[in-house]
C-alpha cells in the first residue's frame, strides 16, 4: 500500500494543501465541544493524538475537524443528509465502509475507532474518508476470536 502523504493526496485529489488527519484509537468522532485543544488531547498525551494532523502541522488547526464532528453528532432529522453532505463526501465514507464489511476488516472505525484518515479537501470543501492499515482483514485473528464476524 502506498504511503498516505502529500504526494498521494496530489495523485488522488489533485490538491495537497488541505488538512490530513490520521485517526487512530480512540478517534470515535464524538463531539466534546468546540475547543480544538480537546480533540488534540483526547489521549492526555502530548506525544500522541487520536486525530493526528499529518499536513500543515505548523498551523495546527483543528477548527474544520471540530465542525465536521459537530455536524456528525447533530440530531437526525429530515435535514441531516443535507447538513452532513455539505462537509463530508458521504459517498467516500459509504464506499470505505462497504469494503471494510466485505473484507471483514474489524480493526477499523466501526469496532476500534481506528485506522482511518480524514482529508479536508480544499477543492470540494468537504472531508474525504478512507481506511488504512488493513492487515486485519479476511478473517485474520490475533486474539483467538472470530473478528471477521464482528462487522
Please give the residue ranges for each predicted region:
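Phosphate/dinucleotide-binding and metal-coordinating scaffold of catalytic cores
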Residues: 1-151
Amino acid at each position: 500500500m502506498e504511503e498516505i502523504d502529500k504526494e498521494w493526496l496530489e495523485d488522488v485529489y489533485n490538491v495537497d494543501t488541505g488538512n490530513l488527519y490520521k485517526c487512530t484509537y480512540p478517534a470515535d468522532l464524538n463531539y466534546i465541544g468546540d475547543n480544538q485543544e480537546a480533540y488534540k488531547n483526547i489521549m492526555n498525551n502530548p506525544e500522541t493524538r487520536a486525530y493526528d494532523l499529518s499536513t500543515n502541522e505548523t498551523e495546527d488547526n483543528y477548527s474544520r475537524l471540530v465542525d465536521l464532528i459537530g455536524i456528525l453528532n447533530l440530531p437526525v432529522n429530515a435535514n441531516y443528509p443535507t447538513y452532513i453532505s455539505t462537509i463530508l463526501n458521504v459517498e467516500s465514507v459509504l464506499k470505505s465502509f462497504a469494503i471494510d464489511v466485505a473484507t471483514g476488516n474489524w480493526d477499523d472505525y466501526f469496532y476500534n475507532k481506528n485506522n482511518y484518515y480524514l482529508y479536508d479537501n480544499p477543492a470540494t470543501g468537504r472531508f474525504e474518508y478512507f481506511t488504512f492499515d488493513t492487515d486485519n482483514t479476511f478473517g485474520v485473528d490475533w486474539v483467538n476470536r472470530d473478528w471477521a464476524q464482528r462487522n
